[in-house]
Amino acid sequence: MRIFAYFLSSLLIFTTVNSKEFRIDFSDEGMKTLKKRGFGKKTLYTNGKDDKGWYLKAEANDSATGLGMEIEKDLLEEMPFLNISFKIERDFDVIDQKTKDGHDWTARVMVGHGKKIGAKLVSLAHSSFLEEGFLQQSPWTKGSRDYVISNDKSGEWHTRKINVKELLEKTHGISFTN
């Protein structure tokens, strides 16, 4: 099964209420700052530009890897909100994302604290089968949570604004005050 997801860089940004922002850049130059995460080379990433700005397209068959970057904890304290825009071209037909066998997402952005196994992670995910706001412990790891931010089936771009700092504090008890 081939799954497509697009992420729009002009809206994949960390912001504050004071309008500071940190953009994740999907231009050719910006792509050099993203590191491949996961095992193998299972996802094809291409970038492009349309009237809304640069975007990242991910294509995967059966399993996927990710792209990532490290940001300082201070940045999350200063800019707790993540604005993410994405469009799902093709979704899963049937899948039970609550189980280990069906634990797969058409699109997700993982945020977390820590670099090694045991890191505290939250997957901000799209699901056509679960309600927005659904939260569960990952069936694969104790330190990872799945949080559904979208179940839109329109095939159009949609944007969500998530307070990542608050979500990490709520799901993992991570303190950002020290």
Region roles according to the model:
Residues 106-109, 146, 154-178:
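Extracellular beta-strand ligand-recognition surfaces/modules
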Residues 89-156:
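Extracellular ligand-binding interfaces
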Residues 12-16:
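Hydrophobic core
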Residues 26, 73-93, 162:
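Extra-cytoplasmic beta-strand recognition segments
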Residues 19-38:
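Extracellular carbohydrate-recognition regions
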